[in-house]
Design a protein with these regions (language model features):
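Cap/lid segment of the alpha/beta-hydrolase catalytic domain
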Residues: 213-276
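Gly/Ala-rich beta-loop-alpha elbow adjacent to hydrolase catalytic centers
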Residues: 301-305, 309
């Protein structure tokens, strides 16, 4: 199996020479159909992609397309509720589109040789997973981690956003299976081997409800997560102890300047290992929380964190409630929807998409697991105008969860932060479980 060269900017594929990007490679098609047709188009695209403002202008036609489609069809999808169009919604759509365009820098684009290598990794993973029976029985892919005890954790104090907190650090202990594609690359991320979580708890030893709040992509720091996950509401208004774990390669575990950058890249096996490790680390964290006399344990995640929370809701039988906010539920589908046309076409040509990726990601898809959380304690919220985690992603999770309570707000991906509707929904959802379980503990 070919190994990727790691480079300082976090692109594990290596290489910035433009000739490499354009030249044919021995392990891929010498001159493909895409090469012949798309050459002039790619030259113009590369010129524009190097300029941040030029990339940001893509938001204008994309926003107009969204508004026009919604006006013509009266809906954002065949089975999705009709959006309530407004200037505010259009502005949030434009914000999402601009952020997406700005994120698509040239160094995030794969080299020509990367397609064959990534395709080979996925094909090898698919073959291995089929032999082991993991694709048909995804539960069996996830090993039960050892419990976490206080003696395993080092604690330090910190301060962010006007609030003190404890920081827990421990050895993750996670490693991919031997000979699993991408395992060596993943284990080379040394800072990722230490798991970490921010803990905000009430003084005293009284039993309390706990919530594990899981951040999204590019987050993982207290000053971001406290606001992004509404820690103050959960802690002060609902009286919960709040734990905010850092996902693999995020926050203190990052290996590049951008938090989480290698997690969501063209190295698709990174996402498989990252999600598997996230589940492993949080399951260990849950064992420690249970030792604290928790009256209930809830999961709340946004975006990428909602994806992880949704997997955990189908694996761990001791979760009392789960809230999936602006969730992702289909990684290969998300990759295709956000990839430029050229990359998408080449990925299909090299048989990365359209079979292998979809099969491999079954082992880390929330749609592969039947939720163990009670139906009336499953909650979803999503935005009509979300361009980062499209509404169809939330719709699929909601349907897979047998259509529990869902709240659709008129906004984009980050619009939930200033949506009173979302805040009220979150407080009502987690407030219910914390009140019920706390009352039951007192009566007992």
């Amino acid at each position: 199996m070919g190994k990727a060269k790691r480079v300082p900017d976090g692109n594990p594929t290596g290489g910035s020479n433009q000739a490499k990007r354009d030249g044919a490679e021995s392990d891929g098609p010498a001159v493909s159909v895409i090469d012949r047709i798309g050459g002039p188009y790619r030259a113009v695209a590369r010129f524009l992609n190097r300029r941040a403002l030029a990339r940001a202008t893509r938001a204008i036609p994309r926003t107009l397309h969204y508004v026009g489609s919604a006006l013509l069809r009266g809906e954002v999808g065949d089975s999705l509720p009709a959006p309530h169009l407004s200037v505010g919604l259009a502005a949030q759509v434009a914000m999402d589109e601009a952020l997406l365009a700005m994120a698509m820098t040239p160094r995030r684009f794969p080299l020509t040789r990367d397609y064959a290598r990534v395709a080979r990794e996925l094909a090898e993973a698919e073959s291995m997973y089929l032999r082991q029976g993991w694709i048909t029985a995804p539960h069996s892919y996830h090993r039960a981690p050892p419990p976490l005890s206080h003696s395993d954790v080092s604690t330090s104090r910190g301060w962010a956003m006007g609030h003190g907190y404890d920081r827990w650090d421990w050895d993750s202990g996670f490693a991919p299976y031997p000979d699993e594609p991408g395992a060596d690359r993943w284990m080379a991320f040394k800072t990722n081997r230490t798991a970490t979580a921010t803990v905000v708890r009430h003084p005293g030893q009284d039993p309390r409800p706990w919530v594990i709040a899981i951040h999204g992509f590019c987050m993982g720091f207290p000053f971001m997560d406290f606001q992004g996950l509404q820690m103050h509401r959960l802690h002060h208004e609902l009286g919960m102890n709040v734990v905010l774990p850092a996902l693999p390669l995020h926050g203190p575990r990052r290996v590049t300047l951008v938090s989480g950058e290698p997690f969501l890249s063209f190295e698709l096996m990174n996402a498989v290992h990252g999600l598997t490790q996230a589940v492993w680390d949080i399951r260990r964290l849950i064992t420690l929380i249970r030792q604290q006399g928790a009256t209930s344990i809830s999961l709340y995640g946004v975006s990428l964190g909602a994806y992880a929370a949704s997997i955990l809701a189908g694996i761990d039988g001791g979760i009392d409630a789960v809230v999936a906010g602006i969730p992702v539920s289909d990684f290969p589908g998300l990759f295709q929807s956000h990839s430029p046309h050229d990359i998408r076409a080449r990925s299909i040509e090299h048989k990365i998409m359209g079979g292998p990726a979809e099969n491999v990601f079954r082992v880390v898809s929330p749609l592969s697991f039947k939720a163990k959380v009670p139906w009336n304690e499953r909650y979803v919220f999503a935005g009509y105008g979300d361009r980062m985690a499209p509404p169809e992603q939330a719709q699929r999770l909601w349907e897979h969860w047998e259509q529990p309570r869902i709240s659709w707000y008129a906004g984009g991906h980050i619009g939930y932060l200033w949506s009173k509707q979302v805040t009220d929904f979150l407080v009502a959802s987690l407030g219910r479980i914390s009140t019920v379980r706390s009352s039951a503990m007192k009566r007992g």
